[in-house]
Amino acid sequence: MMRIRKVILSIFAFLFLITSNAYADKVRIATEGAYPPWNSKSPDGKLIGFEVELANVLCGYMGHECTIVEQDWDGMIPALRMRKYDAIMAGMSITDERKKVITFSQGYADEVASLAVMKGSSLESLKTVEAVNLSKGAKKTLKTLTTALAGKTVGVQVGTIHQNFLESGDVGKVNVRTYKTQDEVNLDLAAGRIDVALAAAVAFTDYAEKSGKPVVLVGPTFSGGAFGNGVGVGLRQEAQFGSSTAMGKRDGQLLKDFNKAIKKASKDGKISELAIKWFGFDASM
């Protein structure tokens, strides 16, 4: 009886080892495919962008077989927690609020936010300091913005740090209009259906370059505070399924793998190279 039991346990251990190794080598990474130049789609429907190329670089360093899948932004975190995929690379800023439900790798790129208007807007002359880090305080600048945005309709993508900032009260009571994608924000800004928009600065410059529309960045660039501390890979918290379970251990190992790969990609200059290619400047951290 003991011998049979040992054989059965050995079989289970062997099967678990095979399954775990196969599972660990296959990583599904979600991106939105609608936030250029971070991530978008080519005319033939292929996922492209800074994060798509970076994901492939990181997977090569990790030795994992990766599949990049498309996911709507507003369902990004819930689907990760439901194990629809293993990681998120979608221009997702590292914020304290998000860290309550998921974990992040170390940051791989800086993202600064900016307000944008169409040329000729009354807000085009808005002058403030060049850059604002909300973690260090910016009362004077926020007061200026509160006055400037009073009565204006500001467009943002739903579920973003930009929406959270506008609704925080830091710039008074603002008429916020939300959109499912950044593309929709850009189109309504160009059509005059909103007065001003808030998003990553590169999202506006990319749109202006590709569309030829006279989009103008105004006011300061924002970082810190509600805007987070850079962009990283979103991952499940190891404790979500128990740190001692196979799934929990796998999630914990994946975090280590991504951190190691990001450090290598940073040291090798690959992140800088891709950032310059897609953003026009070095946004690596």
Where are the language model's segments positioned?
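Bacterial N-terminal signal peptides
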Residues: 9-19
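Extracytoplasmic small-molecule ligand-binding "clamshell" domains
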Residues: 24-92, 100, 268
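Periplasmic-binding protein-like
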Residues: 33, 110-114, 209-256, 261-278, 281-285
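Short helix-initiation/N-cap motifs at beta->coil->alpha
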Residues: 52, 67-78, 139-142, 176-191, ...
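A local structural motif
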Residues: 56-70, 148-153, 168-184, 191-193
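A ligand-binding cleft/hinge motif common to bilobed small-molecule-binding domains
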Residues: 74-78, 91-101, 164-169, 195-230, ...
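A conserved helix-loop-strand patch within extracytoplasmic ligand-binding domains
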Residues: 93, 100, 104-154, 159
